[in-house]
A protein has these predicted regions:
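Pyridoxal 5′-phosphate
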Residues: 1-158
Length: 158
């Protein structure tokens, strides 16, 4: 179990310094202070375990999933489905098929707004986002509301 997984499943407080060690970029100092990275809506820093897993995949297993009968494709498919199952267990999904991997939060929000929203939001409906939302979670809902005659509401944060 990685330090991050251990921290996320533990009932004790985060050991922030231990977690920071998994992210080499966070060892950098900026203007004499420890680097703090909070722009996770744009991109998220990866812990070493993820970097190592990606390096292994791209150098040893790189192949299309669900697209081939050759060994590399079968191995990639197995790894992909195993990851889907583990994520599903971690978030208590009813079944692994509920887990959809996308490139990032922006793509995910667009998929929900354009897929679910176009089918279920109509004239007079209200879509609510919080005042804290990143731009990428506002624009798709603005566009959807304009197209469907719905109202976009912003919930204030105290």
């Amino acid at each position: 179990m990685s330090v991050l997984e251990e921290s996320l499943t533990s009932t004790v407080a985060f050991d922030v310094e231990r977690i920071r060690r998994d992210f080499p970029v966070l060892q950098e100092r900026v203007r004499g202070k420890e680097l703090v990275y909070l722009d996770n809506a744009a991109t998220t820093q990866k812990p070493l375990t993820v970097a190592y897993a990606l390096q292994h995949y791209y150098t040893n297993e790189n192949a299309n999933i669900h697209r081939g009968v050759h060994l590399l494709s079968q191995q990639a498919t197995f790894s992909y489905e195993r990851a889907r199952g583990r994520v599903g267990q971690f978030i208590n999904a009813a079944e692994p098929g509920e887990i959809v991997f996308l490139r990032g939060a922006t793509e995910a929000v667009n998929l929900v707004a354009h897929g679910y929203g176009r089918q279920h939001v109509g004239p007079g409906d209200e879509v609510i986002v919080s005042q804290m939302e990143h731009h990428s979670n506002i624009v798709p809902w603005q566009v959807l509301c304009e197209e469907k005659g719905a109202t976009l509401r912003v919930a204030p944060i105290n």
